[in-house]
UniProtKB/Swiss-Prot annotation:
GO terms for cellular component: ribonucleoprotein complex; ribosome. The keyword RNA-binding applies. It comes from Aromatoleum aromaticum (strain DSM 19018 / LMG 30748 / EbN1). This is Large ribosomal subunit protein uL24. It comes from the Bacteria.
Length: 105
């Protein structure tokens, strides 16, 4: 079970966008994820007439390592560590380690 998933709101812990919040758009692989509005770079794109692409400078999000983000805890209003707990009915749920609240209600 992944501790951070697509659609979660996260806080950036390290790097040029430290402290910014964003929503996880996708997981690139097991260790990296795309966060909306965070780690934006300008990419120079060459025109390709065969595909109908015009050239120019495109601004896009680049992946962040999962260790550089923390799940946003709305009760504490900050990034928080996440644990996994097994309930009585056998379901695995995520919870915030600071206050024990369930992430997946």
């Amino acid at each position: 079970m992944n501790k951070i998933r697509k659609g979660d709101e996260v806080v950036v812990l390290a790097g040029k966008d430290r402290g910014r919040r964003g929503v996880v758009l996708s997981r690139v692989d097991d260790e990296r994820l795309l966060v909306e509005g965070v780690n934006r770079v300008k990419k120079h794109v060459r025109p390709n007439p065969l595909k109908g692409e015009v050239g120019g400078i495109v601004e896009k999000e680049m992946p962040l390592h999962i260790s550089n983000v923390a799940l946003f805890n709305p009760a504490a209003q900050k990034g928080d560590r996440v644990g996994i707990r097994v309930l009585e009915d056998g379901r695995k749920v995520r919870f915030f380690k600071s206050n024990g609240e369930l992430v997946d209600a």
